């Protein structure tokens, strides 16, 4: 799993991309947890595009868990949903493992 928090913009997107691509040399599945990202610039989206191409080329199954800021930019820049998105890390892990997420049972007061 690769997790980022704070901001991903032109100042650090290259570092993010380089780190993510370096992980791709030894994995078959990847979850990119961006749920704690507060600002996500167009350079961050470009990073996800590069990562998507690499994962496709290397047959790496991957999922992204976006924050509100990331989801907003994906809605604008990725209308065809080429970046795979899950609502939570647990959901992403289950999807990559080929399992359905567990049902969470909650007791209801009588």
Residue ranges and their predicted role:
Residues 1-38, 50-110:
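STAS-like cytosolic regulatory interaction modules
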């Amino acid at each position: 799993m690769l997790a980022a928090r704070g901001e991903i913009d032109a100042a650090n997107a290259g570092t993010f991309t380089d780190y993510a691509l370096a992980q791709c040399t030894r994995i078959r599945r990847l979850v990119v947890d961006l749920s704690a990202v507060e600002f996500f610039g167009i350079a961050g989206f470009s990073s996800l595009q590069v990562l998507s191409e690499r994962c496709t080329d290397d047959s790496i199954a991957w999922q992204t868990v976006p924050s509100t800021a990331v989801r907003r930019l994906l809605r604008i820049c990725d209308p065809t949903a080429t970046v795979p998105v899950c609502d939570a890390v647990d959901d992403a892990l289950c999807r990559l493992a080929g399992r359905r997420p567990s049902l969470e049972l909650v007791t209801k007061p009588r």
